């Protein structure tokens, strides 16, 4: 049990640096707008056992408004978690995106997601490109997705210009 309370946006990743960047972006957001969506971050490696997945789904996922999971190694890396999160999201109508943990598309993860593919791709690209600006844009876009507006989302900024 990670001991987390429910949040509007939940992001799971095995990359601590990615989670730290999103935590810093959330701190910046809350400075500007303390009433903005809440964020819960967790390292998926802390949810390795089926029971920990079940507890997390019950305590956090079922109450989320958007769930984003980034998995290196695809569904095979975390099959029980993928199945349980997909089931909970379907039952509760929660938008869910399973994203590859690297820069290669993963059709199987996309198929387990219920968020439209363009939205999945945009969220993924914010994380692939990295950096503070893209972390801010990731959270801005996530907030727009849960509020019903996303037409004015800024494109991911390439971390390294070609």
Label every PLM stretch briefly.
Residues 1-162:
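An N-terminal assembly and electron-transfer interface module characteristic of large anaerobic redox
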